């Protein structure tokens, strides 16, 4: 498998990007990587690593898209950017997929304009796997589509189901619709109409799910518009971070707390690992004609390595072709 990695995207590029690529390369003997970005900077970072030189290429790109750039304008104007060049490789089928920790807006815009949508999918969606109390779960969409139609939510559910089955090996995953109550008649016109479509779709739809029940992980896939999903994602991240900080402050506030903290240190480490985004790689942008994974902006080498692993699993699961086949089978999507 061959993938492109945006060497200039993210808070710690290119150092952590390159390190993550090397780690992934050394763990996967059939993997080839093209790192796009400023050639001299990337090659300088590569000098400190041991790797198979035949399996890493550097594609020079002189421009960088920043988070301050207008996403659409940057994709149109910065043709020589590391992100643009990587996306072009996907479009030309020279690589199977791309990973970037750069601007989310530019990544999604570029994936749409350059790589293109799967025929029959109206709107691709951003879908991270998130840690839950009992099991990991997916939220789809978390920001690609602030406003949606009921049919969009049905397509999100379909794409999420295929992705979840292949990546987490869960057969016929449960699907819930994020809403303010569990009753069928609750919610906006969007959720009411989406409920009807999901109920009759043949998917394993279990009904509405209230936000307070999301963190359990008892429902595999949570479907919502991108505005709602982004709010869930950022609230989840913020609450988790604050809980760890509060726990740390309480433990350090007394002698007894320090003793208790020392005894519970292994448990705290396990919990922290479970809620660490680095363990999950990135969010897949599902519904485009290529594997597009958006890594967290502050990704380190471990996060990049896991994002690459995610790409590999996406490829092995043949997810794009599976989505195309499922579109033919479900008449309500047409």
UniProtKB/Swiss-Prot annotation:
Q: What assembly does the database describe for this protein?
A: Homodimer. Probably interacts with PlsY.
Q: What is its EC number?
A: 2.3.1.274
Task: Give the species.
Answer: Clostridium tetani (strain Massachusetts / E88)
The family database entries (InterPro entries) matched by this protein are listed as:
FA_synthesis, Phospholipid_synth_PlsX-like
Predominant subcellular localization, coarse grouping: cytoplasm
Annotated localization: Cytoplasm
Q: Which Pfam families match?
A: FA_synthesis
What are the entry keywords?
Cytoplasm, Lipid biosynthesis, Lipid metabolism, Phospholipid biosynthesis, Phospholipid metabolism, Transferase
Q: Which PANTHER family match?
A: FATTY ACID/PHOSPHOLIPID SYNTHESIS PROTEIN PLSX (PTHR30100), PHOSPHATE ACYLTRANSFERASE (PTHR30100:SF1)
Q: In which pathway does it act?
A: Lipid metabolism; phospholipid metabolism
Q: Which Gene3D superfamilies match?
A: Isopropylmalate Dehydrogenase
Provide the Gene Ontology terms for cellular component: cytoplasm
Q: What is this protein called?
A: Phosphate acyltransferase
Any one Gene Ontology MF annotation carried by this entry is: phosphate:acyl-[acyl carrier protein] acyltransferase activity
Name the source's superkingdom: Bacteria
What biological-process GO terms show up in the record?
fatty acid biosynthetic process; phospholipid biosynthetic process
Q: What does this protein do?
A: Catalyzes the reversible formation of acyl-phosphate (acyl-PO(4)) from acyl-[acyl-carrier-protein] (acyl-ACP). This enzyme utilizes acyl-ACP as fatty acyl donor, but not acyl-CoA.
User: Per UniProt, what is the name of the gene that codes for the protein in this document?
Assistant: plsX
Question: What family does this belong to?
Answer: Belongs to the PlsX family.
Catalysed reaction(s) here are: a fatty acyl-[ACP] + phosphate = an acyl phosphate + holo-[ACP]
């Amino acid at each position: 498998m061959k993938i492109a990695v945006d060497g200039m995207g993210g808070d710690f590029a290119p150092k952590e990007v390159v390190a993550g690529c090397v780690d992934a390369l050394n763990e996967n003997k059939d993997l080839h990587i093209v790192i796009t970005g400023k050639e001299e900077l990337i090659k300088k970072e590569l000098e400190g690593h041991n790797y198979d030189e035949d399996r890493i290429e550097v594609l020079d790109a002189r421009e960088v898209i920043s988070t301050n750039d207008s996403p659409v304008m940057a994709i149109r104007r910065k043709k020589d950017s590391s992100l643009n060049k990587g996306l072009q490789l996907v479009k030309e089928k020279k690589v199977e997929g791309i990973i970037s920790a750069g601007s989310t807006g530019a990544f999604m815009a570029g994936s749409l304009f350059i790589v293109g949508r799967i025929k029959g999918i109206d709107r691709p969606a951003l879908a991270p796997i998130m840690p839950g109390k009992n099991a990991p779960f997916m939220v789809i969409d978390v920001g690609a589509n602030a406003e949606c139609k009921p049919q969009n939510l049905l397509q999100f559910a379909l794409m999420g189901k295929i992705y979840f089955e292949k990546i987490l090996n869960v057969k016929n995953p449960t699907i819930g619709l994020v809403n303010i109550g569990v009753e069928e008649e609750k919610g906006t016109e969007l959720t009411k109409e989406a409920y009807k479509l999901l109920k009759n779709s043949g998917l394993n739809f279990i009904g509405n799910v209230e936000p307070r029940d999301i963190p359990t992980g008892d429902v595999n896939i949570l479907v919502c518009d991108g505005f709602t999903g982004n709010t869930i994602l950022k609230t989840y991240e913020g609450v988790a971070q604050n809980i760890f900080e509060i726990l740390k402050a309480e433990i350090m506030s007394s002698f007894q707390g320090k003793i208790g903290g020392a005894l519970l240190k292994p448990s705290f480490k396990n919990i922290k690992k479970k809620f660490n985004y680095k363990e999950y790689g990135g969010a897949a942008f599902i519904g485009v004609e290529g594997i597009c994974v958006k890594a967290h902006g502050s990704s380190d080498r471990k996060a990049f390595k896991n994002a690459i692993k995610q790409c590999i699993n996406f490829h092995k699961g043949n997810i794009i072709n599976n989505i195309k086949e499922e579109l033919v089978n479900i008449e309500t999507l047409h």
